[in-house]
Amino acid sequence: MKTKLLVLIAAFILFPAAIIAQPSRIVGKWYTIDEDGNRKSLVVISKKANGTYEGVIEKLLTGDPERLCENCTGTEKNKPIKGMTVIKNMREDGDRLTGGTILDPANGKIYNCSITFDKSTGDLKVRGSLDKRGLIGRNQTWKRAVN
């Protein structure tokens, strides 16, 4: 009887922690993958002190590694893509991140974003969409960078 009680108590303590810990799998270094399956850039996703998540381009893997974001607008216009924060203001929503935006440096456009960790593959499913509900947009699969 004591054993069953201990198992039950442990389940109530550990189960919520497992749910809360899911977005932490998203933190780390990820390769963005183009439509042909090639690596385009290395993005570092981190959690900020205010609880939001962001993604910064650490390295460009194709073309000129020092190129500028010529198609961007505002403060990002003609700034180096390397070092640019392309994912902003993402918040935990269960086992995924939502509510923020993602910048596509190729066209300078900013899209609504959601990010989900795929437990079966270990990949990230990144969706950029025109609408906040994510109905009109496209998906990318990002691969974890191994040191």
Regions found by a protein language model. Name each.
Residues 14, 104-124:
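An exposure/low-complexity boundary signal
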Residues 1-24:
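Bacterial Sec-dependent N-terminal signal peptides
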Residues 32-35, 39-113:
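Central antiparallel beta-sheet cores of small beta-barrel/beta-sandwich binding domains
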Residues 56, 125-127:
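Beta-strand residues in well-ordered beta-sheet regions across diverse protein folds
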Residues 24-40, 138-146:
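K/E-rich alpha-helical interaction surfaces of small helical-bundle regulatory domains
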Residues 29, 52, 121-123:
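Structural motif
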Residues 121-123, 130-147:
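Edge beta-strand at a domain terminus
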